[in-house]
From Swiss-Prot:
Pfam families: Pantoate_transf. Pathway: Cofactor biosynthesis; (R)-pantothenate biosynthesis; (R)-pantoate from 3-methyl-2-oxobutanoate: step 1/2. Catalyzes the reversible reaction in which hydroxymethyl group from 5,10-methylenetetrahydrofolate is transferred onto alpha-ketoisovalerate to form ketopantoate. This is 3-methyl-2-oxobutanoate hydroxymethyltransferase. It is found in: Cytoplasm. 3-methyl-2-oxobutanoate binds at D45, S46, D84, K112. Homodecamer; pentamer of dimers. Binds 1 Mg(2+) ion per subunit. Its main location: cytoplasm. It catalyses: 3-methyl-2-oxobutanoate + (6R)-5,10-methylene-5,6,7,8-tetrahydrofolate + H2O = 2-dehydropantoate + (6S)-5,6,7,8-tetrahydrofolate.
Amino acid sequence: MKPTTIASLQKCKQDKKRFATITAYDYSFAKLFADEGLNVMLVGDSLGMTVQGHDSTLPVTVEDIAYHTAAVRRGAPNCLLLADLPFMAYATPEQAFENAATVMRAGANMVKIEGGEWLVETVKMLTERAVPVCGHLGLTPQSVNIFGGYKVQGRGDEAGDQLLSDALALEAAGAQLLVLECVPVELAKRITEALAIPVIGIGAGNVTDGQILVMHDAFGITGGHIPKFAKNFLAETGDIRAAVRQYMAEVESGVYPGEEHSFH
């Protein structure tokens, strides 16, 4: 199987072909996803909540991300593998580069960082040193204490215009992917159409180029609150491999996410 690359996703955007991505944290699930053709994965700092049992992503360390990245890479050698830089791992461009090098050596193809225009110099430094960057705007979980909880972002003209400005700034600085989380569908459409780079949505409607879900949400194994944008594909299929295929098929056809999973 040919490796999936950033260029693969760029071609999907050009061809208007939606693509599915998912979080992965270990060898076994990574191998299962790859075997079913789901070849874009994120080692997210969401592991702090789903794997480690914390109430936020803030306790996750670079070493945690590197450990899980190495495990996922062994399970899916040809996938496009993104890895989060966790909270306080990129406070300066120099710190970001040092920590990005750690997760890249562990097997990541790209690092994901949360934030807007203040990250421009960091994105430039990373991309100029051969570290591909995925931006993350909207609901950025590392900022949960600023937001006062996990809330929809970008509502209203001023907030929406700021997110669009942030997205354009990240792209101009060299970011090659963007994740949009928990924003109104209308804003997600504006940003997706304004950018040349692929945009991956989570809680952003079906108007983005790709979708991502935390695997625990996709299979209904999350305790407690279930996000509005989540769908339990395992409940519908009764088989985890079939659930992966169903998720991919519904993303590619635009069936998922539906109106019931979207914000306005």
